[in-house]
């Protein structure tokens, strides 16, 4: 197999990033407009923080969080229940030969950010930073 001369690092390729961003934007628009035929899902405001795609673009993992943080378990279940309809809507926008299979995970970025802030507020860490 030929080596990819444009990407040799451990991170995602430009194509993965571009496709992930298009999926994120499309998913956000669909959820904001309430295009999904599920009243439970349409009642919730959902933030799509990031979408990561596999190197072969067959799987897309969307990191989601309900606005306000309430109902986190329900969000993943509702999105998974409606992933066929969401995948069809994304496929129309993407224009790829194959539409990636959607997987949903809770976005824990804000939790990690709070932990980092708390760590920097500790006296021992503050002393180390001042030195």
UniProtKB/Swiss-Prot annotation:
One GO cellular component term noted in the UniProt record for this chain: cytosol
Domain of life: Bacteria
Pfam families: RBFA
InterPro entries in alphabetical order: KH_dom-like_a/b (IPR015946), RbfA (IPR000238), RbfA_dom_sf (IPR023799), Ribosome-bd_factorA_CS (IPR020053)
PROSITE patterns given in the database record: RBFA
Cellular localisation: Cytoplasm
GO biological process, alphabetically ordered: maturation of SSU-rRNA
Keyword Cytoplasm appears in the UniProt entry: yes
GO molecular-function terms, A-Z: ribosomal small subunit binding
UniProt entry keywords in alphabetical sequence: Cytoplasm, Ribosome biogenesis
Function: One of several proteins that assist in the late maturation steps of the functional core of the 30S ribosomal subunit. Associates with free 30S ribosomal subunits (but not with 30S subunits that are part of 70S ribosomes or polysomes). Required for efficient processing of 16S rRNA. May interact with the 5'-terminal helix region of 16S rRNA.
Record note on quaternary structure: Monomer. Binds 30S ribosomal subunits, but not 50S ribosomal subunits or 70S ribosomes.
HAMAP family, per database record: RbfA
Protein name: Ribosome-binding factor A
Provenance organism: Ruegeria pomeroyi (strain ATCC 700808 / DSM 15171 / DSS-3) (Silicibacter pomeroyi)
């Amino acid at each position: 197999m030929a080596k990819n001369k444009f990407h040799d690092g451990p991170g995602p390729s430009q194509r993965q990033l571009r496709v992930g961003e298009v999926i994120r934007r499309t998913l956000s628009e669909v959820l904001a407009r309430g295009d999904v035929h599920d009243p439970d899902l349409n009642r919730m405001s959902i933030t799509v923080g990031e979408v990561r795609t596999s190197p072969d673009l067959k799987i897309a993992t969307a990191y989601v969080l309900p606005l306000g943080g309430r109902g986190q378990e329900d969000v993943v279940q509702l999105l998974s229940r409606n992933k066929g309809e969401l995948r069809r809507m994304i496929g129309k926008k993407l224009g790829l030969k194959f539409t990636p299979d959607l997987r949903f995970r809770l976005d824990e970025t804000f939790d990690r950010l709070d932990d980092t802030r708390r760590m920097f507020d500790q006296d021992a860490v503050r002393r180390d930073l001042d030195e």
